[in-house]
Amino acid sequence: MRGSSPRMTSPAKLIDLRHMPLHLDTQADLEQAIHALVKQDPRLKPIFEVAGMPALRRREPGFAGLAAIVSGQQLSTASAAAIWARVSAAFDPFDHDSLRRARADRLGRLGLSAAKIKTLKGVAHELAAGRLNFDVLANEDADAAHHTLTSLHGIGPWTADVYLLFCLGHGDAWPAGDLAVQEAVKIGLGLKTRPTAKQMAPLAEPWRPLRGAAAHLWWGYYRAMKKREGVIGGQEKANSVLNKLPVAKRSSAKAKITG
């Protein structure tokens, strides 16, 4: 647990979240946050009863983590894994400087599209110039960090939120554009239509500063409902990056989770 957060209000009651994790570094952090959310917002109790306690998902932070997410955008799980395996193995070490210096045609032969090459080289140049610092990013609040990432060429809201949540473990990152979370919220809150990314922002306000934990809960609900009811089996699949993220052990040990 890296810090504490200010008090947060909800329409029903005042919940003291001073001891809640700002970052979800361990399974214990996530469990503490989920229990606080369920207590704070009674609407989440039936969601938790269906989903159960979700497992913390983390992956490597820094340039490698962001590069893996970008490489896997809009691809099947198998294709994304194969391309990332080739890209990461082609450089020793794999870092922003190595990729920045690599020829575009070499990267293309590894399976990266021209758009993804441009995005990754752009990020690498920002890091080399000192205009982007992942250590600083890790300590910014979720909205500020999201803005920093989406100001980079080719980094959209979904990519930024997934990086903040799974690579940095940011407890308040909210993937408003994720289709699975949108569909789960629609079903769980009894909405008539699936909310848009813009509509998801106010829906998540009661869950600040633990929106990242809420996202874990909604993903768990999505998986449970899809398996149990089949009601969302025909919906678009969430980005394949999520499907291959390592799952933290269910132990309540205090050791940090490594991606």
Predicted regions and their residues:
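Intrinsically disordered, low-complexity, charged terminal extensions of DNA damage-control enzymes
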Residues: 2, 9-62, 223-259
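Short amphipathic alpha-helical segments
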Residues: 41, 45, 64, 68, ...
